Amino acid sequence: MVSVKKIVASALVGVLMFSAVGCNMVEKTQAAIDKTTVATVNGEKITLGEVDSHLKGVFTQMKSQYGDKYMDDPQVAQQILQQRQGILNSLVEEKILVVEANKENIVPSEEELNKKIEQQIKLYKEQYGEEGYKKAVESMGYNEDTFKEYLKNQFIADAAASNASKDIKVTDEEAQKYYDENKKQFEVQAKGVLARHLLFENEEEAQKAYDEIQSGKTTFNDLFTKYENNKLEKKTPIAESFVVPDENAQVAKEFVEGLKSLKEGEISKPIKTQFGYHIIQAGATYEKGAQLPFNEVKSQIIQILKQQKDSQKLKSDMDQWKKDLNVKVYDDKLQEGLKISK
């Protein structure tokens, strides 16, 4: 028979433990905090540890600025809470899009994904250098393999997002209406030259296009028209036009130098920048305050309106997918380990 003293002792321990937890006197270990479920998507859990792994760089900065007890500072805790919320929202939406991509059978092939991943990593290394790239990857909580997996999921999610808006179009009438109602937006901010350019991923494609223009097989304008919607569809090559200011141009140095060597109407040989290979055509010179004509900004306007429509469509679809996949988000759990002022 169990003694009465043992029963009473057990009961008291239970009451005291309940009270302590209720008053936050018993603090969770970091391991327990990391295992806290902050969302579920289609039955798959997202833990707080997964969220925080994306904030390693932020935590390092906070620790350097505020010391080891930075999470005890209510203002810092509030900032971290906001960061966690943003990361969680991104993770939830990424998982939803990956599910939808698989459901719609639009996941790119392994070969295509690997090619995209290698190209993206190569671009990062060219922009930030080998050491800068490694530090950036580590600050986001990844190693080389997990970063590649992250990029893979991003490309799969992009496929689902693009598929959701594939039938959305912007008419010339809508573009003209936007131009007429927002003319101030298309005033030149500083004197400069209008640059129209074709951007290719590699030198071979750029050289082939240049040779075809020079031989008369095609024209720069024909290629510009052919490629000007590619940016919207996340395809290459792309075609863009914009005014490059005479001074303090926030454009790649090689691009500016290539443009300055051209007279109006002339076309450059392929020029390499960190973004790829450009064939540039020099346009007219515009004074500050001049109005850019509709035909020179039409593709920009279509891009603006398409992005607006895409965003609205994706938001609507996302709301429905969250219901279909029984998505649960526990925002209150994001406060774990933080001292949030009431």
Swiss-Prot record:
Q: What is its EC number?
A: 5.2.1.8
- Lipid-modified residues of type N-palmitoyl cysteine are C23
Q: Which reaction does it catalyse?
A: [protein]-peptidylproline (omega=180) = [protein]-peptidylproline (omega=0)
**What's one GO BP annotation on this UniProt entry?**
protein folding
Q: Where found, per UniProt?
A: Cell membrane
**Domain of life of the source:** Bacteria
**Secretion signal: which residues?**
1-22
Per UniProt, the keywords (alphabetical) are: Cell membrane, Isomerase, Lipoprotein, Membrane, Palmitate, Rotamase, Signal
Q: Which Pfam families does this entry report, sorted A to Z?
A: Rotamase_2, SurA_N_3
Classify the protein's membrane topology as the record does. Lipid-anchor
Q: What is its main location?
A: membrane
Q: What InterPro entries does the record tag this protein with?
A: Foldase_PrsA (IPR023059), PPIase_dom_sf (IPR046357), PPIase_PpiC (IPR000297), PrsA_foldase (IPR050245), Trigger_fact/SurA_dom_sf (IPR027304)
Q: Where is the lipid attached (S-diacylglycerol cysteine)?
A: C23
* Keyword field contains Membrane: yes
Q: What class of enzyme is it?
A: isomerase
The chain positions of domain PpiC read 190-284
Sorted alphabetically, the Gene Ontology cellular component annotations on this record are:
plasma membrane
Q: Does the keyword Metal-binding apply?
A: no
What GO MF annotations does this protein's record show? peptidyl-prolyl cis-trans isomerase activity
Q: Which NCBIfam families match?
A: PRK00059.1
Summary of the function given for this chain in its UniProt record: Plays a major role in protein secretion by helping the post-translocational extracellular folding of several secreted proteins.
What is stated as this protein's family in its record?
Answer: Belongs to the PrsA family.
* Listed name of the protein: Foldase protein PrsA
Biological source species? Clostridium perfringens (strain SM101 / Type A)
